[in-house]
Amino acid sequence: MPLSASLPSKNYDYDYDSVQPYFYFEEEEENFYLAAQQRGSELQPPAPSEDIWKKFELLPMPPLSPSRRSSLAAASCFPSTADQLEMVTELLGGDMVNQSFICDPDDESFVKSIIIQDCMWSGFSAAAKLEKVVSEKLATYQASRQEGGPAAASRPGPPPSGPPPPPAGPAASAGLYLHDLGAAAADCIDPSVVFPYPLSERAPRAAPPGANPAALLGVDTPPTTSSDSEEEQEEDEEIDVVTLAEANESESSTESSTEASEEHCKPHHSPLVLKRCHVNIHQHNYAAPPSTKVEYPAAKRLKLDSGRVLKQISNNRKCSSPRTLDSEENDKRRTHNVLERQRRNELKLRFFALRDQIPEVANNEKAPKVVILKKATEYVLSLQSDEHKLIAEKEQLRRRREQLKHNLEQLRNSRA
């Protein structure tokens, strides 16, 4: 992450990235400490944090966007202290370093800068040295602007379509500097081109044809960007329910929702309309059918209503207090115990009845259940074997009877 610092100022540009990071050139890294020792009393000795530059190799960063600050008031001839610091820092850190006469990348003074000397901008002595360097650079800059002022005034006037020439003297430096800022701002994209219809409720006002983009911006108001407009939209909106409906909405919508939509709807050029309506809490029914439902008969409607009432009652019972829940659990436990006792009594009586049917354990009142079941199984098997024997004997007797009947019939026929 590149190192950056911001001076303590109330200007809004210092809240962002007005001060760019600084980097060493490869051929000048070796002479850094040597140059610092030669300066002696002019600058402070190297801080412990300066070893960071030897450990990390920072990559160059792309140029930052030009500042969109507005022009200063006409009454102020000299810029404020914060504006002076901003002017010097922009000249030190921007792309103008390679093109201006203040410092040259090949010059040794660029490496000896107090800003590069203290990479973290820490310490009160570094701040004092920085203020001293800034004041010297600003004085040199203003002197060069004052020298260039009369020369600019002696030149022929620009065509009527161009901006008027700035005045000479101390105001010339500020005027030319702000003129450069206006030219840099003119190269930027106007937010009104990207957002022809702003997100706020106000109607877009047409700008004059010859207006300068830098002059259109207020002194105290920062430029309108997409991030600012998004934040304003988030702060202004208080949406309870957002519904996206067609422009030709059905006539079955209620009057309350229509009034709410008329009050809160914003103009939009698409066939879809964004509406905000306040829905009553008691009308929230997620299981309800859509608006295009078929009307049910009266009897079926009554059944549905009664079913809903029963569901609500059951839900209310479920959502009762903890005391009622405890009482219900106790009742259920008591009922379960009673039913379990009855079941055990019935089972015991059935075992007693089974014991009485088995001859071997009929008189044994203390016979366990396992013995009763085992003897009962044996007794059932013996009864089944006896049954099979009796069935076979019965079949033999039936055949003997048939044989005897046949013999009797033959005797009767022989006598006749």
From Swiss-Prot:
Residues 228-240 have a biased composition (Acidic residues). GO terms for molecular function: DNA binding; DNA-binding transcription factor activity; protein dimerization activity. PANTHER family: MYC PROTO-ONCOGENE (PTHR45851). Residues 212-227, 245-259 have a biased composition (Low complexity). It comes from the Viruses. Transmembrane segments: none annotated. Residues 144-174, 203-267, 314-336 are annotated as: Disordered. Efficient DNA binding requires dimerization with another bHLH protein. Residues 383-411 are annotated as: Leucine-zipper. It is found in: Host nucleus. Residues 331-383 form the bHLH domain. Keywords: DNA-binding, Host nucleus, Oncogene. Its main location: host cell. Residues 314-324 have a biased composition (Polar residues). It comes from Avian myelocytomatosis virus 29 (Avian myelocytomatosis virus MC29). One of its GO terms (cellular component) is host cell nucleus. This is Viral myc transforming protein. Residues 156-169 have a biased composition (Pro residues). Transforms avian and murine macrophages and fibroblasts as well as murine B-lymphoid cells. This protein is synthesized as a Gag-vMyc chimeric protein. The sequence shown here corresponds to the Myc homolog fragment of the chimera. Pfam families: HLH, Myc-LZ, Myc_N. SMART domains: HLH.
